[in-house]
């Protein structure tokens, strides 16, 4: 965080920071092809309207991480930052129960011990939380995945509190974006952050200061509205949607690698047991 901290960093902490992170290439083969496998320092944006399976996918990936290797998991730690106060522990436990061959209380406790939860109620609190993570990341080399659900929670609040100044509207999220990039790079993490579709496709009336259309996104309907600092650090964008039927449990996603501009489409169902790819 600061020069004083860096001078105090021990050799053990340095090794933990640089060498102790497990590979996440096998996180979800159904979602990430070999060439798009997540690597340390990658930042993924999960984008879409409410109710399109973004948080369910986060539960799925979290379960994959915290399950023991003997049960097909990666046996690594996850930090989940909830800004909507929508995190459903019972839902995650249900997903884990369906994946544990012996769903004992002890086995469940061991899985959940690998999960760290933080709650934030404002963009400033999110920024302060991120600033406080460095000591945790140094001391927990098995903590490999950082999740923020959702990064767009405070968009309208920040826009109002910033008045007519675009710089003030975006100031805190810009700092959060820059800090997230530094943390995932220096500590060799993987970041998944969700953003909600607040801007209607083709609508210009509610454009934010950083909103822009992306013709190369084709029919995905992505409309950037968060600060340019965030748009710059994202390496992969995954657009979620729901099939036409209002109560359909079938969802679709389009994954776009922003450097190569390659697109991949997937479909999945949300069952009681969690996400199932079609």
From Swiss-Prot:
Protein name: DNA repair protein XRCC2
GO MF annotation list: ATP binding; ATP-dependent DNA damage sensor activity; four-way junction DNA binding
Tissue: Expressed at low level in somatic tissues and at high level in testis.
PANTHER family, per database record: DNA REPAIR PROTEIN XRCC2 (PTHR46644:SF2)
DNA damage is among the record's keywords: yes
Residue list for modification Phosphoserine: 10
Assembly behavior: Interacts with RAD51D. Part of the BCDX2 complex consisting of RAD51B, RAD51C, RAD51D and XRCC2; the complex has a ring-like structure arranged into a flat disk around a central channel. In the absence of DNA, the BCDX2 subcomplex XRCC2:RAD51D formed a multimeric ring structure; in the presence of single-stranded DNA it formed a filamentous structure with the ssDNA.
Job of this protein: Involved in the homologous recombination repair (HRR) pathway of double-stranded DNA, thought to repair chromosomal fragmentation, translocations and deletions. Part of the RAD51 paralog protein complex BCDX2 which acts in the BRCA1-BRCA2-dependent HR pathway. Upon DNA damage, BCDX2 acts downstream of BRCA2 recruitment and upstream of RAD51 recruitment. BCDX2 binds predominantly to the intersection of the four duplex arms of the Holliday junction and to junction of replication forks.
Gene Ontology BP term (one): centrosome cycle
Localization, UniProt: Nucleus
Entry keyword DNA damage: yes
Main location: nucleus
SUPFAM superfamilies linked to this entry: P-loop containing nucleoside triphosphate hydrolases
Stored InterPro entries: DNA_recomb/repair_Rad51_C, P-loop_NTPase, RecA_ATP-bd, XRCC2
Keyword tags: DNA damage, DNA recombination, DNA repair, DNA-binding, Nucleus, Phosphoprotein
Family as reported in the entry's similarity comment: Belongs to the RecA family. RAD51 subfamily.
One cellular component term from this protein's GO annotations in UniProt: Rad51B-Rad51C-Rad51D-XRCC2 complex
């Amino acid at each position: 965080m600061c020069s004083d901290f860096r001078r105090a960093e021990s050799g053990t902490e340095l090794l933990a920071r640089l060498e102790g992170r497990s590979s996440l290439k096998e996180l979800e083969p159904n979602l990430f092809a070999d060439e798009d496998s997540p690597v340390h320092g990658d930042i993924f944006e999960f984008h879409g309207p409410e109710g399109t399976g973004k948080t369910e996918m986060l539960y799925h990936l979290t379960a994959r991480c915290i399950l023991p290797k003997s049960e097909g998991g990666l046996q690594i730690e996850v930090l989940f930052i909830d800004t909507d106060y929508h995190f459903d522990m019972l839902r995650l436990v249900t997903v884990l129960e369906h994946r544990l061959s012996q769903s004992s209380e002890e086995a469940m406790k061991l899985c959940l011990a690998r999960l760290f939860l933080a709650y934030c109620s404002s963009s400033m609190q999110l920024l302060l939380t991120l600033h406080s993570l460095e000591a945790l990341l140094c001391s927990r080399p098995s903590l490999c995945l950082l999740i923020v659900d959702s990064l767009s929670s405070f968009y309208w609040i920040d826009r109002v509190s910033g008045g007519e100044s675009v710089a003030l509207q975006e100031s805190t999220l810009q700092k959060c974006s820059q800090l997230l990039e530094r943390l995932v790079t220096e500590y060799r993490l993987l970041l998944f952050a969700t953003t909600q579709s607040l801007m209607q496709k083709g609508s210009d009336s509610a454009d934010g200061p950083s909103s822009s259309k992306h013709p190369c996104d084709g029919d995905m309907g992505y409309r950037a509205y968060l600060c340019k600092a965030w748009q710059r650090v994202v390496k992969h964008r995954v657009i979620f949607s729901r099939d036409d039927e209002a109560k359909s449990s079938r969802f679709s996603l389009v994954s776009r690698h922003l450097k190569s501009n390659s697109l991949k489409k997937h479909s999945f169902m949300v069952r009681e047991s969690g996400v199932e790819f079609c």
